[in-house]
């Protein structure tokens, strides 16, 4: 693994290795024996979008592993926000830092940056992919279930970055994946081409009740990210009936897990009651962002 830009960068073996290392690092942190695997290493945390979990978990993770993490707002603190070409920023930061984490908009910009930087680059979220979040989801499921193989995962929501990454990651991990989206909100075409190679292990549906039937894990994410706008009003109409409620969860297995990448918009993609019922799973999922990202850093920079 040279970079982590999207889930399809990983082989099944590499994916499971990340989870294995994450579990080891989590146990070591709980025991107070975290190794200084990044001693003398520096990581640029470049963010073009706001962030709570991604920024803080990377900052804390780099620190816990003995490295230096520098946060920078790409829009207001770097010359790239004033028009400096991306290729120049990449070639400069690659000479200062051992690794760059970038949260940005366009996947093509991230991939161009990775080609030029000369150091490992990690996707902190683009409009196309959210691999760090999905690795945390898979870790959380494996901790609870003991295995990912054969588990039925149902994603309900917008077919954007979370759906794209969950589909690929779940299938690579040996899961059965169902994606439920309204018409007009399908996952990326290349992701669907990848998924259909897995035959009956993948289903794309528009009916949430059909999708959650006998699911081991249900995952949702916010789909109304610009409240008060015409786009928001359209989405509220289009996603009517896609809220994860207690009644919907009755169609899943009795012990089904429910995950949410956060932030959660209660009353939209998830009901407040269901969120609180599954809050421990959801916040364990959020905690596991720290551990999987430490694992990715340790693999890329310390050769684990």
Language-model features: locations:
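Active-site cofactor/substrate anionic-group-binding motifs, chiefly glycine-
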Residues: 42-43, 47-96
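Rossmann-like adenosine-cofactor binding region
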Residues: 196-273
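Positively charged, low-complexity intrinsically disordered leader regions
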Residues: 1-56, 60
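Active-site-proximal loop->helix
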Residues: 70-93, 116, 166-169, 186-200
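Adenosine-phosphate binding glycine-rich loop
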Residues: 255-256, 261-304
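Anion-binding alpha/beta catalytic cores of soluble intermediary-metabolism enzymes, centered on
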Residues: 81, 98-169, 260
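Glycine-rich phosphate/diphosphate-binding loop of Rossmann-like nucleotide-binding domains
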Residues: 48-60, 143-221
């Amino acid at each position: 693994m040279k970079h982590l830009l999207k889930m399809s960068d990983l082989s099944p073996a590499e994916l499971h290795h990340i989870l294995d290392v994450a579990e080891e690092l989590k146990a070591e942190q709980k025991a107070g024996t975290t190794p200084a695997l990044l001693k003398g290493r520096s990581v640029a945390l470049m963010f073009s979008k706001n962030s709570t979990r991604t920024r803080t978990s990377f900052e804390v993770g780099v620190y816990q592993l003995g490295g230096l993490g520098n946060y920078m707002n790409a829009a207001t603190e770097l010359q790239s926000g004033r028009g400096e070409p991306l290729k120049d920023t990449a070639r400069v930061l690659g000479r200062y830092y051992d690794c760059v984490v970038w949260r940005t908009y366009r996947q093509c910009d991230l991939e161009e940056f990775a080609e030029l930087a000369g150091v490992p680059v990690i996707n902190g979220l683009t409009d196309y992919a959210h691999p760090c979040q999905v690795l945390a989801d898979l870790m959380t499921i494996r901790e609870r279930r003991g295995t990912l193989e054969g588990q039925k995962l149902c994603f309900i929501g917008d077919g954007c970055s979370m759906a794209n990454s969950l589909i690929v990651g779940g299938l690579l991990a040996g899961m059965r994946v169902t994606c439920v989206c309204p018409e007009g909100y399908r996952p990326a075409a290349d992701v669907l081409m990848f998924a259909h190679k897995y035959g009956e292990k993948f289903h794309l549906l528009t009916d949430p009740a059909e999708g959650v039937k006998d699911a081991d894990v249900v995952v949702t994410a916010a789909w109304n990210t610009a409240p008060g706008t015409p786009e928001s009003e359209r989405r509220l109409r289009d996603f009517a009936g896609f809220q994860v409620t207690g009644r919907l969860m009755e169609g899943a297995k009795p012990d089904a897990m429910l995950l949410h990448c956060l932030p959660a918009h209660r009353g939209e993609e998830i009901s407040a009651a269901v969120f609180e019922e599954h809050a421990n799973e959801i916040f364990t999922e959020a905690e596991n962002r720290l551990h999987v990202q430490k694992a990715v850093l340790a693999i890329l920079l310390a050769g684990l």
